[in-house]
Amino acid sequence: MSNESGRFLFTSESVSMGHPDKLADRISDSILDALLAQDPHSRVACETLVTTGLAVIAGEISSKADVDYEKIVRDTIVAVGYDDPDIGIDGKTCEVQIRLDAQSPDIAQGVNSDEASGKDIGAGDQGLMFGYACKDTPELMPLPIALSHRIINRITEARFNKEVDWLRPDNKSQVTVEYDGNRPVRIEAVVVSAQHGPDVSHDEIEKFVIENVVKPSIPAELDKGDIKYHINPTGKFIIGGPHGDCGLTGRKIIVDTYGGWGRHGGGAFSGKDSTKVDRSAAYMARYVAKNIVAAGLAERCEVQLAYAIGVTEPVSVHVDTEGTGKIEDAKLCELIREHFPLTPGGIIDHLQLRRPVFVETTAGGHFGRDGEGFTWEKTDKADALAEAAGATATA
């Protein structure tokens, strides 16, 4: 997205770990992590469906690991906060169906090449993946999605800390930011839907959410005193989670990425091991874009990588700095190929993606995060890129 002049509004949303689609993501990645903990070379494509009183796990898994799938499903549902049938699903008593097969040998033959050394692994599928970074926030994320995540993280913290007794697991946020060119200047509107128990008034919910959730989460300088608040705008939100809506793995791909700012290749992340470039190459694309911005080579940067199934090298690399680049985008493409490993095996090794680190990605977004597991958020290539770009510019 390029808009160097003029004012405009942009909106992004986030959802909590108790949202039915996010609960499904969390179950899928909990299974992935359990398998990787025992067998780092596990091949996993695990999909989850959750609805009233039922969780269904289906997909393709090839692994030497021996895990109790049903226990993982139940433990995950309870840990999120669904431990009472009155709120839609109880992990202790709900029905759990497991429908898992081995990975197709037709897919495996294109991926297995020299896997013992971790090199020359072919891509697990064709596809295109995007990464994005910008200077809106310290974590180099677009501000609307960053603020939406902060609000969700804060309401989740309030629920787990029992700051009030009426909060339930299913929560949503949405933030509209006004920009002047590429600069965020004010917050236009905030929407929060907070699932709650039956014995609380709308006024109490609204006051708590605005004063204790939203205001601590947004920059004071962007609050001009005229924010439009929409807190539980339907009036009540008692029925939620899998009881209110059926949840499926992979249905919150915009929440998982950049909130609609920049493009998306269409592939979901959760439940997939890192031979699936839908996940690993999207992480690498973010890593590349973030390092380009951190190096001062652009204010905004979108990177596209594209792959063919069974083929090691990407079929294309594309960069779009939205007119903010300090050197030509074509030169940045050359630097990317020189400084970043772009084969599936190289990505897996460099970002250490065979570790059981993925369940933490399922709430709060996959990008703009802290923590040891989020290796794709490092900016350890920035200095080398800046130096190489300087040499390129003077050559």
Curated annotation (Swiss-Prot):
Cofactor needs: Mg(2+); K(+)
Enzyme Commission number(s) from the entry: 2.5.1.6
Record keyword Signal present: no
Keyword Magnesium: yes
Stored HAMAP family: S_AdoMet_synth1 (MF_00086)
Binding positions for Mg(2+) per the UniProt entry: 21
Annotated GO biological process: one-carbon metabolic process; S-adenosylmethionine biosynthetic process
Compartment list: Cytoplasm
Residue sites binding ATP per the record: 19, 170-172, 236-237, 245, 251-252, 268, 272
Chief localisation class: cytoplasm
Pathway field: Amino-acid biosynthesis; S-adenosyl-L-methionine biosynthesis; S-adenosyl-L-methionine from L-methionine: step 1/1
Self-association state and partner proteins as the record states: Homotetramer; dimer of dimers.
Residue segments, region Flexible loop: 103-113
Residues that bind L-methionine: 60, 103, 245, 276
Record's protein name: S-adenosylmethionine synthase
Protein purpose: Catalyzes the formation of S-adenosylmethionine (AdoMet) from methionine and ATP. The overall synthetic reaction is composed of two sequential steps, AdoMet formation and the subsequent tripolyphosphate hydrolysis which occurs prior to release of AdoMet from the enzyme.
Transmembrane segments: none
PROSITE patterns found in the cross-reference section: ADOMET_SYNTHASE_1, ADOMET_SYNTHASE_2
GO molecular-function terms, A-Z: ATP binding; magnesium ion binding; methionine adenosyltransferase activity
InterPro entries linked: ADOMET_SYNTHASE_CS (IPR022631), S-AdoMet_synt_C (IPR022630), S-AdoMet_synt_central (IPR022629), S-AdoMet_synt_N (IPR022628), S-AdoMet_synthetase (IPR002133), S-AdoMet_synthetase_sfam (IPR022636)
Cofactor-binding details, from the entry: Binds 2 divalent ions per subunit. Binds 1 potassium ion per subunit.
Residue numbers binding K(+): 47
Alphabetical list of PANTHER family matching this protein: S-ADENOSYLMETHIONINE SYNTHETASE
Recorded name of the encoding gene: metK
Protein keywords: ATP-binding, Cytoplasm, Magnesium, Metal-binding, Nucleotide-binding, One-carbon metabolism, Potassium, Transferase
Catalytic activity, reaction form: L-methionine + ATP + H2O = S-adenosyl-L-methionine + phosphate + diphosphate
